[in-house]
């Protein structure tokens, strides 16, 4: 009997096929809880193990060689400076000898001591004390200079009078009357002396100012050792922060060292400090002008400049917003630089003035978008359910169909009588590491970039531009054309709550994915594809797996914020259900998901069922007529026979089936794997789809043709594989068909490019896929996981379809259950 969900691990490591068929489908236990090394339950993209005796969150045994379980690496501590040590250095600096005699002559030791004794609170002398001291010193210096000047003047006059008298008394011909000084000559001589006196008076007037300049740079170190006063803890406002000179350098007594009033060095050290970036002065000697910031006129100039800039800058910004966007398509108000985007040509010829100034730079401003293709760029701030309709066209056409086997959108799809043939858009709007490894592989294991939460947090301010570029590049209109051409008719689109809002300290890129979701729905409409909405991540995380946004603890209906996140998830559905209840979505959004893969093996089952009922009633009250899906929560499908019996109308049960996360199924050889699908799964799905023996309408929302778990990051970032026995720490058990007999299984062939696949391997992969299509087609149908991947070829429908190991048309497979299983040639079982 069947072992049906990807969570089921009935077969485990059994090599005796008879045991498999002794198992019965109606076993009411969740048949997954033996503790044999090969019998641990595994799920897609995780290593969950569960103890049925409790509802505790799963215990994730992360590889300690990859991830340190301790806290993040501690920050490097700031250097601790010893205040007393610095003071001692300054004290020793005061004791260092000054080599220049001229400096010692100018030193006024007693005056310096008294000046330091009159410092104010800011560490400098009070203004009144400075004025008094300057006046006192100026007067004392002036008196001896006046006496010297008068003595020199008197001596010159006496010499002049003596010379004149000698000329009159002399009988020498050279001193005769013909050479006597005339009155004019005497007047000129007096004028010469008067000019000399005037120069001396000018020098006297200039002397106080020069003395003031010198005093500002007067050394505090004289012949006698003196100690510097301690520096204040905080530099007073307006006082320059002098560079503190190394005490060791001062103690060495370098002759070129000069010390300034606040601990800085003189000209000899200027070049060195300028290189260090800590010295802003321009003085070339002790008598140079003070720095510009100490000059009053510079303060006035700076003040005027500040006022002018305060006026000019805001005006320039406003003018650039109003007039600068015609020449700059990216927009000056854009929060993201999209100038390198190849997808904004639709802005050509448009004026940014069409966007109200209040909306410029916002999420509604197309000039901030990385991709404007196929959006209506006419501005509107209209919302439905609080969600914007910006980008949507006001008209639509529902007359399209993807192929002649299905009705057009404006006619009802015959659910129940015709199977869904669809694909998922995993890894696009809800990022998943194994689908887009390029976003994760450049980080080291120490960074622990393991999900969208940690990725966005690491990216910081560049998260929006990086993530939106992924949105624009990963899926395009051509993908929907290819889906139609591949014979598909439905698309399950993953998105998460941050498309609508974010909470608390969420690092997610908020709201940008919303417009990409809306455009994807319009592409589906254009090519006749119906849509299944799939909220892949809801507040708090419903399963603690990386594809919910954040790997770790389950915070939805569980833990401290369990009830808060319960309400937040209902608020989320209240908004999006109002939006998608609009008439424009009635024909295209035909399936409405509530939450992807809630881990009911850990969560209280009744709480999940009650929330499911409340959410379904809420969205249907808001006008949703689409089928509402509830996931099986990884419980045994037989249990669902008795669950939600009084549920609202128009509901689907959603089950996800994989063989590679079940250690009892991954060890099956190629032929037995096809038999498992056609014998066990076929009957299981057929039965659960009935209301008499099962639950009722059931879809398979996820499955794949992957036959190994070898894809990079499939089992979480940094984890190994079951296929090669590197999955779990301390457990090297290998789960593959030749584990016991050899040869050794390898991921090399499974991860090889599809061009290297042998014909036998391609035949197996296509038969394996078509067997699952046949089994799930007995119910409401299927959605392949997933349409596109960067490198995981066995998980990409597009890659398989283009490389010849998927049917050319999904509705025309080569194999169906009941047919003879074809030969796969000499295909080895170890890959």
Swiss-Prot record:
It is a single-pass type II membrane protein. Gene3D superfamilies: Glycosidases (3.20.20.80). It holds the Pfam family Cellulase. It comes from the Eukaryota. Residues 319-831 are extracellular. GO terms for molecular function: glucan exo-1,3-beta-glucosidase activity. Coiled coil: none annotated. Disulfide bonds: none annotated. It catalyses: Successive hydrolysis of beta-D-glucose units from the non-reducing ends of (1->3)-beta-D-glucans, releasing alpha-glucose. One of its GO terms (biological process) is glucan catabolic process. Its main location: membrane. The keyword Transmembrane applies. Keywords: Carbohydrate metabolism, Cell membrane, Cell wall biogenesis/degradation, Glycoprotein, Glycosidase, Hydrolase, Membrane, Polysaccharide degradation, Signal-anchor, Transmembrane, Transmembrane helix. The chain crosses the membrane at residues 298-318. GO terms for cellular component: cell surface; extracellular region; plasma membrane. Its EC number is 3.2.1.58. Belongs to the glycosyl hydrolase 5 (cellulase A) family. This is Probable glucan 1,3-beta-glucosidase D.
